[in-house]
Amino acid sequence: MTGVQTCALPICNGGRHIPEARWREHVFGYTIVNDVSARDFQMATSQWTIGKTFDTFAPIGPLIVTADEIEDPHKLAISLTLNGEVMQSSNTSNLIFGVPHLIAFLSSVMTLTPGDIISTGTPAGVGFARKPPRWLLPGDEVAVEVEGIGRLVNPVVAEA
């Protein structure tokens, strides 16, 4: 199991086929998601979804910063620490797909509705890609921090 940090976009105004130029009209604000993955399940099939759908995966929070509080979501420091050790440190300027593209692309295949949350993706440094891999273990603590938004801290607990 690994955790990766992403910035998340809560949607306020739904829509379909949203042009990139109008993305701001649809973003309520910004929050944090710890995109936890059970890599053993994820790699067992050609579809990654199963490894991301366990109970307690994808914790979100601890708050939502409204869109007017973040001038540019593409200029935010983002980091993940595991037991206090920095595992990922980057900036949202390094996203493969920017927020306007994500909203336009996703709304081209599905209707976005108020309350939907879009995760932006993660920077380099995920645990399973390290040499050697670094898996999450019971007792570990994962902290995800995004500049201007806050810090989300999650303990790793064995499934009962």
Model-derived regions, located:
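Short, small-residue-biased leader/transition segments that mark boundaries at the very start
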Residues: 1-9
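Short, conserved loop/turn and helix-capping segments at secondary-structure boundaries
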Residues: 3, 24-27, 96, 136
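Short hydrophobic-aromatic micro-motifs
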Residues: 8-11, 29-32, 64
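Short, conserved beta-turn/loop elements at beta-strand boundaries and strand-helix junctions
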Residues: 12-16
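N-terminal accessory regions of nucleic-acid-interacting proteins
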Residues: 17-30
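Catalytic-pocket segment enriched in acidic/His residues
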Residues: 31, 37-160
